[in-house]
Amino acid sequence: WNYGAKAARTAFAEIAEAIAAYEQVYLFVRPQDKASAQELLSSDRIHLIEAPTEDAWARDTGATFVVNDQGGRRGIQWEFNAWGGQYDGLYSHFEHDREVPERICNFLGDSFYNARPFVLEGGSIHVDGEGTLLTTEECLLSPGRNPSLTRAEIEEKLRQYLSVEKIIWLPFGIYNDETNGHIDNMCCFVKPGEVLLAW
């Protein structure tokens, strides 16, 4: 980030404050950045979790949460390899990012499933809450994710951990996306049976 990430931090703070008007917000901050984060944030609905990370995109590095029929919540800790590992990952040191799911679950007091070594980022899937999942072949079938698994085996993992019944595979994500075609920047459910699509 240029200039000590000042503009980015201000933008993150504005987004967090806007969301906090409606929802609780949890932000990871490096220990050395906590004081400056506190200066930018005023809502008591924003909670800072002190932890080192290599990347700011918690949707990808963080836990995926599932809720059972009784309302109990649990996280899922996928394997994270910086969007492709040795094959075409974006960076080689991601040890702290791998710890993000466990850290957030511990902070919230939630238990979690350990789905490792299955590689998945949160932005590579989108669900409707009623058993349907969207993803792309470009991403989940990428040689940098789970090269030893077949498409059917990947689908079984998704069904096992997310309790989905229907998996819709789009062939590609947005052209030249550095995440190998994540679904979250091109297609998402707004309600069951209805999607928004970047065109």
Task: Label the model's feature ranges.
Residues 1-199:
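The feature marks the mature, well-folded catalytic cores of soluble enzymes
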